[in-house]
């Protein structure tokens, strides 16, 4: 299965009548492996900050997490594995695998829990595949 198919079929799938606003699979260096049409362009320093938070959980909490200049308040995730952010009625979930970052961005009416489920399920699957 292509990386684009993982984004289209697994991340952008319909959940209880809703779907993510945008999604992507990135390399740890920020290289885009596949993305949805509306996925924002990360800046290199944003990826650096995200990767540092995986290595040093809590790094982003004081300043927030920036994605394409949009600021997300960092909320509880899983240290070293999942970063979650909130911005207004939406948010972001980032799951780190051995080689990739699985990213989902949502807006209401999708819930944070639905976003977490979609992103983390694919991330867990990729980890089991050695990715």
Curated annotation (Swiss-Prot):
Name where it mostly resides. Answer: cytoplasm
An example Gene Ontology CC term for this record:
cell cortex
Positions carrying Phosphothreonine: 111
Q: Which domain of life is it from?
A: Eukaryota
Q: Name one Pfam family in it.
A: Profilin
Q: Which Gene3D superfamilies match?
A: Dynein light chain 2a, cytoplasmic
UniProt KW Glycoprotein keyword: no
**Which modifications occur after translation, per UniProt?**
Phosphorylated by MAP kinases.
Q: Provide the alphabetized UniProt keywords.
A: Actin-binding, Allergen, Cytoplasm, Cytoskeleton, Disulfide bond, Phosphoprotein
Record motif Involved in PIP2 interaction, residues: 81-97
Can you provide one Gene Ontology molecular function annotated for this UniProt record? Answer: actin monomer binding
- Disulfide linkages recorded for this protein, renumbered to the chain, are 13-115
InterPro entries in the record: PFN, PFN_euk, PFN_sf, Profilin_CS
- Where in or outside the cell is it found? Cytoplasm, Cytoskeleton
> Tell me, how does this one assemble?
Occurs in many kinds of cells as a complex with monomeric actin in a 1:1 ratio.
Functional summary from the UniProt entry: Binds to actin and affects the structure of the cytoskeleton. At high concentrations, profilin prevents the polymerization of actin, whereas it enhances it at low concentrations.
Identify its protein family: Belongs to the profilin family.
Q: What else is known?
A: The variability of the residues taking part of IgE-binding epitopes might be responsible of the difference in cross-reactivity among olive pollen cultivars, and between distantly related pollen species, leading to a variable range of allergy reactions among atopic patients.
Query: Which named protein is this?
Result: Profilin-5
- Native organism: Olea europaea (Common olive)
Q: What is the lineage of its organism?
A: Eukaryota, Viridiplantae, Streptophyta, Embryophyta, Tracheophyta
